[in-house]
Amino acid sequence: MKTIEISAPGKIIIAGEFAVLAEAPAISMAINKRAKATIIEHNKNIHVLKIIGFKDKELLFTVNDNGTIEWLDVVLNDPIKLFFECLWRQINIIPTAFYKFVLDTSGFYDEISGLKYGIGSSAALTVAMAGVFIETFKLPIGVKELALKTHREFQGASGSGVDIATSLEGGIIKYFRMERIKTTALELPEDLKFKIFWSGIPVSTPKQLSKVKTFSKTSFSNLNKMAVKFASIWGCNTNKLFIDYLDEYTDALMEFSMEYDLNIFGNKHNILL
């Protein structure tokens, strides 16, 4: 009985959030919180989907002759089912054996409160799932292509793809939404020291994106310019220049947040500024 496990990291965007939806770059950093996807061949005559992290549970299903999942319970519109089905539809396989599929995002939740951090768990899990499905079933598709198709179907194609790219590449990257511009690897300025803080309050990314219905406002234009400016100084390798430009970018982000009523700095983030 074979077992294959693949993991992928979450991410934190240093600069370029929202601006990357247009033509500006995003600077994104992978972090050591990983989603794990495992496929285990077993001798039960049923497929099992085990979820760890988001509402721990096990779901049973079969696959019909058309390659469609048929769940054995009657709960409708379960987000986990919908997410899993999004990937399954992309590959449309009919397994010749039975498997246990384990999706583990427990590292993306606060151990005390149980709240989600908001550091790209769905993208990390999508990349891990794409990798483990391709490896297990020898699929003729790349991890990037399968992960992007799955994630965009699940999110309604509203995201930029930066979280998928970060989970795939690791490290720190400069990412453009336009596919013609290649993602490039970056290094932090030498001797730069930093800490990552979590406000303790989760925010819905789809809800935030729904408020940005037009890119015509002045604050969005300013945010784009500052995202481009900030990305341009990478490689200069001076901490002062890095921090000065990051301060300017943060000011532009605050202006954008107020004009679009996003409350980006409302959950105690402003205390750190």
Each model region followed by its residue ranges:
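DPxDG-like acidic metal-binding loop motif
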Residues: Y117-G142
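Residues at secondary-structure transition points
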Residues: A22, L59, A124-T126
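C-terminal nucleotide
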Residues: M1-A15, A19-V20, S28-I31, K36-P95, ...
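Domain-wide signal for the mature, well-folded portions of proteins, strongly enriched
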Residues: G114-Y117, D163
